[in-house]
Amino acid sequence: FRSFRILFKQMESLYINTPPERIEGGLSFQHGFSTVVAAKHIGQDCRIFQQVTIGFNGTEQPVLEDRVEVSAGAIVIGNVCLHSDCVVGAGAVVVNDVNENTVVVGVPAKPIRLNRE
């Protein structure tokens, strides 16, 4: 097993490039390894899972409103807004705004249903 661990080291990095004054309370990371967050603003009680990228498209950054969930492996890029209570499914690539209370999946991300949590 030792050689396996040497060849396949787990990436344990969590990089946050959002100023603390632009992050509301309650932000949580579930297994935040290999995760990059460079949002313009992060609302209250957002949840971000592992291997997520939230970042620039060269000039603009995403906005996450309140109670947004970004699932494992998702990418949110550029001048987009994830409105309150939306969910981004695992592996989705978000390049457009996501409406309030909406679940999106796929590449590019498309709405599949309302979030009724």
Task: Enumerate the language-model features and the residues they cover.
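Terminal amphipathic alpha-helical/low-complexity segments used for targeting or macromolecular assembly
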Residues: 1-12, 117
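Structural signal for interior beta-strand "rungs" in well-ordered beta-sheet cores
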Residues: 10-112
